[in-house]
Structures are given as C-alpha cells and as structure tokens.
C-alpha cells in the first residue's frame, strides 16, 4: 500500500510532522493564532528589509538621503518602507499578545520553549533598536546616543564598552555601519531560534486553554488549524494594509523626518512605542545603574516564571479568578507605562511612573502567592 509522499520523503516527512500532521489539542482559541502571525511578520520583515538594503547607504552623510531616495525614486520604495516600518509595530503587537497568552495560560510550564522565546524577545528588541538608528534622523541619532550610553553605568568596563559599541568617542559613521550589519544579521538569528522554539514545543506538545493533558483528544494541525491560521492572516493583512496605505507614518516620530544634528537636542527623546514601557521603568529609577538594571529586569523577569510552576495545581488562569483580575490589571499597568514613556520627564508623570514600576514588578511576586492561596482555599 502506497503512503503519501509527505510521509515517505525524508525532508517532507520532517516538515509534515512539524506542520501538517502535527497532533494538536482540539480546543485552541484565537489566542493561539499569534505564533503563526509572528512567523508571517518575520517573513514580511526579512523580505521587505532585503529589498530596502539594496538601496540603503550606511554612511552618516548619505543615510538620510538614501531613505528619502527610496521613498521618492525607487519603484514602490514608499510601499516597501511603509511595510517595513509598520511591520515592526505589528510584529511587536503580535509578540506582546503571544507573551500575554503564554502568561495567562501558563505556557511557561514548558521551560525550554519559554526560555528560548524570551531570548527571541531580547533579540527582537535589539533588532528593532539598531534598525531605528538606520534612517539617521534626529530621534535615530539621539536615541542611539542615550540608549547605548546606558552601558556606561556598568562598573569598571562601562566606558570602554560604550566606546567599543560606538567604534569611537561618539555615535558616528562606525556606529551606523555596524548597526546596519547587526540589523541585517539578527533577523536570521531570530529565524533560527524560532526553529529551536518550535522544536522544543513539538517535543512536549502544545498547551491548551484548560491547561489539561490533551493526549486523548488530539487532531491533525492541517486542515483544522491551518485554515484557522489563514483566516487570521486575512484579518491581519486587512488591518496591516489599512495602516500601511492610509496611515503610513502613524507610528513614526515626527522628529525623525529631520536629519540627525549632534548640535541640536530634541525636546523629548524617546524610543519607538513598543519600547516605551521599559523606557518608563528606566526613567522611574533616579540612579543610572539602578535604572539600567530595572530596564533589563523588566524583560528578564520572564525567565523567572517557570520557577513558580511547583506552586500550583492547575496550568491555566481559567481556574484562578483572583489571578485573572491580577493579570488584566497587569495589562493595564503595561499600557499605562507605555503612555508614561511618551510624557515629558516632569511631575506628575515621574511619580506616576514610579508607582506603575512598583506595580509592574509586584505582579510577578503576587501572582504565585495568590495562586498558592487559591489552591489552599479549595
């Protein structure tokens, strides 16, 4: 009896086992679509970035002009640039939803998968940061200066490290050139780590909304979830191209339409919106080293979540009403921190940012304690 070629060919068999014939829980919700959407975003960013790199010039005298040239003279260059710039924003929207789903449904039970995912998160933030420097506008230059200068807070090696990153004594041509190289390299590293992420996920099997063992109730990924993913892609493209075609500069800082000038400081230096929550936490600490530690800890604390798995009976917040309230409060805190990051450094925004920073980190302390309390209650 003949078997389908996808089950007999060595390469197709491996791909089929990872996608087409993958046994999946039968009760996935819409929140499980964001993983495939992230893969789609990564492909969009790599392809659009590849074509943009063919026309971009990584030199301080030409970078800003080359970006203007792409928008004005290159066939559909304006579309490529809009897709790439807004694609980054949509990438982070999907990423935050994906992480939020993992926290709500306790996907950190799969420790290797979760930790690789957090590494991908760090690498994605690094990719976005070095990419933001490339247009060489005012916010690009001053954002690079401020953020890279934070490394000088590291004891003993800080100053040397900053000069090593800059390639000199200030943000200049050497900095721009190496940032362009990093921005080209990192997405392929993210793609490789995504394969590792999927490898670990397929070793353990996926979580599900109830957090229960679903070995007795699995269905093949294709057609059931492939069609669901395609439906998600269609909705994504609909919203994405509304932004790309009608509001191409909606997520862009107006300061970045001014060429970089080391002699003129912008009124309010801020990163892109997807870094603002971490930037607000950084600003809330009056000490420079403390601010840098808090900035890194705001994301690195995700590594600590798998350490709490021994404290709970169930593997989903569906069974923990108090923790559901706490989780959605945490989401509100995240959004408020993003808003605070846009505000000038003055009262009452400084004080509000400090309160929100304390509440942000308090979630990671209170959540396991309330989980344990609820388990003991019933």
Swiss-Prot record:
Cofactor section: heme b
> In the UniProt record, does the keyword Zinc occur?
no
Q: Which GO terms describe its biological process?
A: mitochondrial electron transport, ubiquinol to cytochrome c
Question: What name does the UniProt record give this protein?
Answer: Cytochrome b
Where does the record place it? Mitochondrion inner membrane
Indicate the quaternary assembly: The main subunits of complex b-c1 are: cytochrome b, cytochrome c1 and the Rieske protein.
Organism phylogeny? Eukaryota, Metazoa, Spiralia, Lophotrochozoa, Entoprocta
Q: Where along this sequence does the record place binding of heme b b562?
A: 84, 183
Q: Which residues bind heme b b566?
A: 98, 197
- The residues that cross the membrane are 34-54, 78-100, 113-133, 179-199, 225-245, 289-306, 313-342, 350-369
Q: Which family does it belong to?
A: Belongs to the cytochrome b family.
The record ties this protein, via InterPro entries, to: Cyt_b/b6_C (IPR005798), Cyt_b/b6_C_sf (IPR036150), Cyt_b/b6_N (IPR005797), Cytb/b6-like_sf (IPR027387), Cytochrome_b (IPR030689), Cytochrome_b_C_euk/bac (IPR048260), Cytochrome_b_N_euk/bac (IPR048259), Di-haem_cyt_TM (IPR016174)
GO annotations of cellular component type: mitochondrial inner membrane; respiratory chain complex III
Highest taxon in the source lineage: Eukaryota
Keywords on this record? Answer: Electron transport, Heme, Iron, Membrane, Metal-binding, Mitochondrion, Mitochondrion inner membrane, Respiratory chain, Transmembrane, Transmembrane helix, Transport, Ubiquinone
Question: For this protein, what does the record note about how its cofactor is bound?
Answer: Binds 2 heme b groups non-covalently.
Q: How does it sit in the membrane?
A: Multi-pass membrane protein
């Amino acid at each position: 009896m003949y078997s389908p070629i996808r089950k007999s060919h060595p390469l197709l068999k491996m791909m089929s086992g990872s996608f087409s014939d993958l046994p999946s829980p039968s009760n996935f919700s819409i929140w499980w679509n964001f993983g495939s959407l992230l893969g789609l975003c990564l492909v969009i960013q790599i392809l659009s970035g590849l074509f943009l790199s063919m026309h971009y010039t990584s030199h301080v005298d030409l970078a800003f002009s080359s970006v203007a040239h792409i928008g004005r003279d290159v066939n559909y260059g304006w579309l490529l640039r809009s897709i790439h710039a807004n694609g980054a924003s949509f990438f982070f929207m999907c990423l935050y939803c994906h992480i939020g789903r993992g926290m709500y449904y306790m996907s950190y039970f799969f420790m290797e998968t979760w930790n690789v995912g957090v590494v991908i998160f760090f690498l994605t933030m690094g990719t976005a940061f070095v990419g933001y420097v490339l247009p060489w506008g005012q916010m690009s230059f001053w954002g690079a200066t401020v953020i890279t200068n934070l490394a000088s807070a590291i004891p003993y090696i800080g100053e040397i490290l900053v000069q090593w990153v800059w390639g000199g004594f200030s943000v200049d041509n050497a900095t721009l050139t190496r940032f362009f190289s990093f921005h080209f390299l990192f997405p392929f590293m993210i793609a490789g780590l995504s394969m590792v992420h999927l490898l670990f996920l397929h070793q353990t099997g996926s979580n599900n909304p109830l957090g229960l063992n679903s070995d007795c109730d699995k269905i093949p990924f294709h057609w059931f979830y492939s069609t669901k993913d395609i439906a998600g892609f269609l909705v994504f493209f609909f919203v994405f191209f509304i932004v790309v075609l009608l509001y191409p500069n909606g997520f862009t800082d107006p300061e970045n339409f001014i060429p970089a000038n080391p002699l003129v400081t912008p009124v309010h230096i801020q990163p892109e919106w997807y870094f603002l929550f971490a930037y607000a936490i950084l600003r809330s600490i009056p000490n420079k080293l403390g601010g840098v530690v808090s900035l890194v800890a705001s994301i690195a604390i995700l590594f600590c979540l798998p350490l709490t798995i021994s404290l709970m009976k169930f593997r989903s917040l569906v069974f923990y009403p108090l923790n559901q309230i706490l989780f959605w409060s945490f989401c509100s805190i995240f959004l408020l921190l993003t808003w605070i990051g846009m505000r000038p450094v003055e009262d009452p925004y400084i004080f509000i940012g400090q309160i929100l920073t304390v509440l942000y980190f308090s979630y990671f302390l209170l959540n396991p304690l309330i989980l344990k309390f609820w388990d003991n209650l019933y």
